[in-house]
Every structure is written in C-alpha cells, then in structure tokens.
Amino acid sequence: MVADAVAKVCGSEAIKGNLRRSWGVLMSADIEATGLTYLANLFTLRPDTKTYFTRLGDVQKGKANSKLRGHAITLTYALDWFVDSLDDPSRLKCVVEKFAVNHINRKISGDAFGSIIEPMKETLKARMGSYYSDDVAGAWAALIGVVQAAL
C-alpha cells in the first residue's frame, strides 16, 4: 500500500515538479512561520485535532509556545526530507515510514491524518500567493497520501 502511494508520487513528473516548485517558494519564506501558519490553520479548520497535541500545552499561544514552535520546525524539516527524496522511491518510503512511527504511537490513523489536507491547502494559498494552484494542492494531497498509507 505504501509502495503504491510512493509510486504514484515518485512516478509523476507533474506531482514532483509541483511539490518542488511550491516547496521552493515555501522555503524561501520563513520556514518556522510556515510551520506555525500550518498548525494555526489546522487548529482553526479542524479544532478536533487539538486533542492530538495536548503534550504541547496551549497551542493558541502560537510562537510564544516553545513546544509548538519545536513541532512546527520539526514538521517543516520532515517535509523537506520528503521533497528531497522524490527521486528515490525507496528513500521516500523509509523517511515516511519513520515519520509515521510517531503518529502510530499516538494512535493517529490514516483517515485522521487526512484531516491535514485542507489546512495544508490553506497554508499553501497563504504562503504562496499567486504561485498557488489546485495542481499544487493536489500534489501535496498525493504526498500526504503516502503518509496515510504508512499509517
């Protein structure tokens, strides 16, 4: 199942191109702010997901919450590893499966993890401006699908 999701992403030049271009735009901005924007969108659009983050304390504090900041930074570096692995399907599978372990330990299912798609779309819109497109959002949904398959 993971192998199929990886093949879909790594086998598509369009998906890889959209991921790389959009990640380049996001990385040229403040990487920490991108992660914090994503988490704020997640908690606004999917308030039910806050229950997965109780160990981080008051997530409403945003940047003032060092645990939340740490999670935002870690998340963006994980995404960076994913994008860097697009030309090596076995490597992408390995880094995604490692990432998935933390979520499996917190009993987050693939379906529950899918709740990040809409907040990711909103983050892309906010951070990319005129560079955003539905194709970009679709590419990120496909990459999220790899993680979902690993869960």
Swiss-Prot record:
Q: Which UniProt keywords apply?
A: Acetylation, Heme, Iron, Metal-binding, Oxygen transport, Transport
The answer to whether UniProt assigns keyword rRNA processing to this entry is: no
Citing just one GO molecular function, the answer is: heme binding
Q: Which InterPro entries match?
A: Globin, Globin-like_OT, Globin-like_sf, Globin/Proto, Mb-like_M
Pfam families hit by this protein = Globin
Keyword Electron transport in annotation: no
Superkingdom, according to UniProt? Eukaryota
* N-acetylvaline modification, residue list: 2
Where, in this chain's numbering, is heme b bound?
103
Residue span(s) of domain Globin: 10-151
The annotated subunit structure for this chain is: Heterotetramer of two alpha chains and two beta chains.
Which family, according to UniProt?
A: Belongs to the globin family.
What is the protein's name according to its record? Globin-1 subunit alpha
Give the species this sequence originates from: Anadara trapezia (Sydney cockle)
